[in-house]
């Protein structure tokens, strides 16, 4: 059975970057690898746990989109893209290509619209499709075969949202009404204005009563008091906000399942990039996991038969998955997972520095300048020991 995953690249990249914001991953070259590491971690988690048969990663284009052209203030409130993210994007694209996963990008349209078009068409064909993103506006696209797949965050696991979950989250009768909700209450993350003075609760009440913005605006005579004034005064703004909030499903892109079919990665190129980024433990996990799993399985099989598996009936990451995504917890791939040194994993500490084989120099950090220097130095270290 086909299972298609469509990933919203920038949503996941930003999420990865800010997941490590208090403890950025800086390699020996001084490069902040947080966004790259977090993105790859999430991608690996999906590939290993959910084993999609087809996959694609959608990016926003470099230039403006039709929404920016229609509304100059669209997303204008957002801060400039952090330099670490800007420098990481080309590397992430190289990694995606090394995984042999198609990059989906259409000039003039956001990743939302590209995913919306492909997911809607896939749903029509009966293909089980997961849109991987934390953005709530994707809820409008959910249907019988199309689901939101929200990435894990902290202790929270991946969340799969179908029709009933979207209806419950927004207190609406249909996922399509997500657009009407956003049109009325606005969306601060995208700087969509909505109707001034109308919040989520009022929007829910109005949509429950009238079903859509169009029907509401044709019955404003039934409204009373201040609410009537707000809606009638801001009629055009409400309609325009719905336009901005609507994810397009007719972008000029074709759903080609052959092109989206999952392939084996280019291991040589992938290893080269990981080594450049100094992702030593990730290299071990990605390239040696199956070998280690097979070896461990042969060694422990008789032990498990005698005493039972440590995890009982819990399936491994490599068991054949069900058609719906796994809800099973796994620290591998978690944006917040800690990465041990590969020698620690193997129980080999012989090459680690210690007091007996290292020169050391005690220093008192008693000025702001010294504090800044020690922090900068510590940020370049992979392993830190605190007494």
Language-model features: where?
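Extended hydrophobic/aromatic-rich secondary-structure runs
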Residues: 1-2, 7, 201, 219
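Conserved RNase H-like, two-metal-ion catalytic cores of nucleic-acid enzymes
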Residues: 3-5, 15-54, 72-73, 77-84, ...
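Non-catalytic nucleic-acid-binding/docking modules located in mid-to-C-terminal regions
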Residues: 51-56, 99-101, 124, 143-147, ...
């Amino acid at each position: 059975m086909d299972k298609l995953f469509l990933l919203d690249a920038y949503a996941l990249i930003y999420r990865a970057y800010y997941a490590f914001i208090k403890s950025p991953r800086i390699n020996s070259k001084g490069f902040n690898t947080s966004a790259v590491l977090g993105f790859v971690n999430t991608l690996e988690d999906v590939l290993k746990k959910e084993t999609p048969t087809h996959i694609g990663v959608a990016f926003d284009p470099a230039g403006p989109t039709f929404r920016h052209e229609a509304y100059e203030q669209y997303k204008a409130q957002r801060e400039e893209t952090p330099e670490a993210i800007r420098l990481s994007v080309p590397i992430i694209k190289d990694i995606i290509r090394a995984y042999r996963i198609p990059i989906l990008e259409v000039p003039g349209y956001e990743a939302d619209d590209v995913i919306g078009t492909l997911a809607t068409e896939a749903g029509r064909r009966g293909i089980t499709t997961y849109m991987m993103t934390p953005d709530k506006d994707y809820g409008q696209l959910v249907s019988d075969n199309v689901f939101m797949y929200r990435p894990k965050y902290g202790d929270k696991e991946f969340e799969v949202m179908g029709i009933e979950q979207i209806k419950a989250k927004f207190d609406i009768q249909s996922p399509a009404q997500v657009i009407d909700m956003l049109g009325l209450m606005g969306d601060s993350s995208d700087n969509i204005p909505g109707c001034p003075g109308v919040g989520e609760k009022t929007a829910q009440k109005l949509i429950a009563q009238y079903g859509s913005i169009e029907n509401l605006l044709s019955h404003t005579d039934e409204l009373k008091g201040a609410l009537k004034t707000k809606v009638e005064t801001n009629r055009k703004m409400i309609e325009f906000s719905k336009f901005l909030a609507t994810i397009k499903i007719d972008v000029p892109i074709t759903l080609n399942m052959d092109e989206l079919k999952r392939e084996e990665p280019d291991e040589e190129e992938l290893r080269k990039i990981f080594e450049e980024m100094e992702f030593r433990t990730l290299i071990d996990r990605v390239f040696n996991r199956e070998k280690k799993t097979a070896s461990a399985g042969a060694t422990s099989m008789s032990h498990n038969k005698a005493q039972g598996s440590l995890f009982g009936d819990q399936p491994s990451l490599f068991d054949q998955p069900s058609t719906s995504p796994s809800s099973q917890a796994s620290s591998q791939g978690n944006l917040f997972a800690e990465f041990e040194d590969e020698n620690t994993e193997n129980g080999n500490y012989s090459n680690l520095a210690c007091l007996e084989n290292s020169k050391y120099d005690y220093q008192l950090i008693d000025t702001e300048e010294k504090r800044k220097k020690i922090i900068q130095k510590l940020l370049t270290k992979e392993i830190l020991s605190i007494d």
